[in-house]
């Protein structure tokens, strides 16, 4: 029996964007692994969050541009930009729900047991703590802040000409 595989068949491919979310699911699974040290687990939640930020700023923004431009071509996995956005919306929501649950219901109680507390707001600080945080931010953080994303306008590149 001679069966040939049609490598153009979308069934053989995973959508690039959805595979990114699956990767983040695997990263987040490390945060749920009780055999991993607590602060490492917290780091995996942070990595997932950072990855999702970049994913939405770059990949989802690109798909939205395609939809806006009425680009209808399907990717190698057979999905249009609109279909990808719909699937991303569903899967990213599920991922963020698991991420939030992992952080707030699993890791935060364990962190508190270790004497590590996260404050919800500036209002949780007493006056002395608030002054310290404000001063620290202005002296150490603010001076090195740089934009992580810029728009495509010429304002940012006009000085280069």
What are these regions (language model features)?
Residues 2-8:
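N- or domain-start disorder-to-order transition segments that initiate the globular core
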Residues 9-52:
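N-terminal-proximal low-complexity accessory segments that begin disordered
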Residues 16-20, 40, 48, 77-84, ...:
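Secondary-structure capping and boundary motifs in well-ordered enzyme cores
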Residues 26, 46-50, 54, 58, ...:
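Short, residue-level hotspots on alpha-helical faces of the histone-fold
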Residues 32-35, 45-121, 126:
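Extended, charge-enriched "interface" segments that sit outside catalytic cores
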Residues 33, 146-154:
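Active-site phosphate-binding and catalytic loops of NTP-dependent enzymes
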Residues 116-139, 143, 147-148:
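Extended, charged alpha-helical coiled-coil/arm scaffolds that mediate oligomerization and mechanical coupling
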Residues 153-161:
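Residue-level detector of conserved catalytic or cofactor/ligand-binding positions
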């Amino acid at each position: 029996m001679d069966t040939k595989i049609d490598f153009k068949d979308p069934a053989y491919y995973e959508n690039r964007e959805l595979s990114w979310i699956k990767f983040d699911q695997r990263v987040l699974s490390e945060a749920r692994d009780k055999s991993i040290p607590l602060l490492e687990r917290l780091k995996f939640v942070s990595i997932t969050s950072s990855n999702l930020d970049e994913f939405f700023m770059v990949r989802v923004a690109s798909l939205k541009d395609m939809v806006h431009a009425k680009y209808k071509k399907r990717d190698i996995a057979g999905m249009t930009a609109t279909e990808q956005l719909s699937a991303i919306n569903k899967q990213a929501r599920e991922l963020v729900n698991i991420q939030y649950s992992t952080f707030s219901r699993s890791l935060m109680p364990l962190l508190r047991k270790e004497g590590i507390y996260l404050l919800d707001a500036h209002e949780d600080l007493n006056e002395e703590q608030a002054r310290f945080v404000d001063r620290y931010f202005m002296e150490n953080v603010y001076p090195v802040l740089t934009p992580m994303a810029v728009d495509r306008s010429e304002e940012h590149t006009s000085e280069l000409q």
